[in-house]
Amino acid sequence: EDYAYPEYQAHVNDSTDYQVYNNSAQQDASTEAVRETAGEVLKYKGNIVTTYYYSTSCGKTTTMKAWGTSENESNGYLQSVEVKDKNGDYEKSLPWYRWEADIDQDILSALLAENVKKNIGTVQSLEVTKTGPGGVALQIKAVGDKGSITVDTENKIRKALGGNGYEIKKQDGTVAQSGTLLPSAFFKVKKAGNIFKIIGGGYGHGIGMSQNGANEMAKKGKNYQEILQMFYPGTTIEK
């Protein structure tokens, strides 16, 4: 499998950060799938594909547009899909499926200045100005009392809003400290007084396979062929 994308090492980082955050054992279903698929390759239109993956989806996946790459012949298998069955989203009961972060105005201002290397003063407003497939943020705009900035693409947006100084509350009530990257770029922003509330879902970049989604599907009796078809539509499994 090909992960030679230095710019996007976040997808490896997401998984390792996630393991640290949750102190979780290796994903059994993914391990089992790897064993079962020994000697087989996943192809799309005759070419071996890069199987992007991340920790947890928000119920939807996104496409390469999240990284500023147009959809084309070679990446057409990375579509925005709904990770659900007739009973709803597979991951709906998992901690990272939904999360919230309350960031104080002064902390947000300092983080943005540090991360984007431009001081816009005290942040007055922060909004998602463009969204992409699956609802991922493609652009954010922050306006401060000394200027404004826009940040484009999933990874750069998560980096701009990352850093130490605030807590992220998962839907099960457990709390994680903020890290280098915002958990995902599937989020909305609300402002209340001096607090910016980021309401988000999922953990990781959201392109390709959700490891926890695959795990939940396997628990419900789905086999690896069905799981791969869900996350990489249009691909074929070949020896």
Question: Can you say where each PLM-predicted feature lies in the sequence?
Answer:
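Conserved, single-site charged/polar hotspot
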Residues: 1-239
